[in-house]
């Protein structure tokens, strides 16, 4: 049987969601927590919610997801740490199948292209819900 893969993941912050501290990440998707727009104090246009990830390093599916086990959270969560499309990065880092950039959905509904050369501090800041 072949299951569909998830090429879009929720943003957990800039910490690796596979690590225990990743559950309490600074992003919008955090284990067993809910956030509303009022919690995104940076402004909706500044907070990344969903982005591309190819699943080349961590084949995944939204079906039957469970947070326990090896790479559990990383199957549906991504994080913004080093930069997009870095070949040597962790499997939870964002990447795409097209060269040069990734597409990111922000909390206000706009989609933005983020280039591979984005400044690391900007890349990390877009992944957190509050300053």
Annotated model-derived regions:
Residues 1-131:
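Surface-exposed loop/linker segments characteristic of extracytoplasmic
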